[in-house]
Amino acid sequence: MLPRRAYANSVFINCPFDAAHRTLHYALVFAVYDCGSIPRSAQEVVDAGEVRIDKILRLIRESKFGIHDISLTEADTRTGLPRFNMPLELGLFLGAKAFGRGKQRQKGTLVLERRRYLYQRYCSDIAGQDIS
């Protein structure tokens, strides 16, 4: 049994897990720990039979804060397809804040993007957000 995690100290980290972005992922995990909080991500294994989207929804529900790196929405060089996992998870997090009840409405979000204002070209609905 895993230790009980406090909602107020849990930070959902939504960033790429591939080798090219491993340094960023480790830096985010370190920074969250260093601030006294608990990093949470889809890489957690509590139940290997849990469907991935259900795991993500559970982690969002259990986390007051979220860090979302949406910088990988460009087309993949091998497939030509964009990666929309990170914007999708950001949308789920923002939806939990907007439509949730009680503590869900207290969620705080940090959104990261590589180039300033690039997100407005592919995700204009968050154009009013402060993106770092």
Go through each PLM region and give its residues.
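Cross-kingdom TIR/SEFIR domain
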Residues: 77-132
